[in-house]
A protein has these predicted regions:
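Glyoxalase I/VOC metalloenzyme domain signal
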Residues: 1-76, 81-165
């Protein structure tokens, strides 16, 4: 329709943007020109991406990178049975870092691709009826996750619903 949209984009490190550290984007488009949710989307209990789970080959190196880049608080470190990984979650960042502890899909993926997102946790209003079926319950970083039945293209569930914090 000819409407001009603009944004600023920057990377925090060399290499492909958004692999280990996220790229930063600032939308300069006036809000009135941006897409607005309508219909069912306007009243949906789904709020958007809450947390990105990043698979890494070395937890300490990744934690140090995030702490330095974002002046982040010390993360909570736990083990995650769902991922077969040691994980670190920051109280002030929307990311969980996962370092595989045994063979499995996460170890294979990190070995093959290096540091990349491996799961996305979608924020949902606490107690709301989101309307999804065939969910599998699990947890990551001591947060309850309801995994959606989406497995394509990676062969396992990677989209999860979490109650907004």
């Amino acid at each position: 329709d000819g409407t001009l949209v603009e944004w600023d984009l920057t990377s925090l490190e060399d290499g492909d943007p958004g692999t280990r550290l996220p790229f930063l984007i600032a939308d300069r488009t006036p809000r009135e020109r941006r897409v607005q949710p309508t219909g069912d989307l306007a009243t949906s209990p789904i709020r958007g991406i809450d947390t990105v789970v990043l698979g890494v080959p070395d937890l300490t190196t990744a934690v140090d990178a995030f702490t330095t880049a974002f002046d982040a608080q010390e993360p909570t470190r736990t083990t995650c049975a769902d991922l077969h990984a040691d994980v670190a979650s920051f109280p002030d960042l929307p990311v969980v870092i996962a370092d595989p502890t045994e063979d499995g899909w996460l170890a294979e993926r990190v070995s093959r691709t290096g540091t990349l997102p491996v799961a996305y946790l979608i924020g949902c209003e606490r107690g709301a009826d989101h309307g999804f079926e065939n969910l599998t319950t699990g947890s990551i970083a001591d947060r309850s996750v309801e995994w959606l039945p989406v497995t394509h293209p990676v062969g396992h569930r990677y989209l999860g619903l979490v109650a907004e914090q």
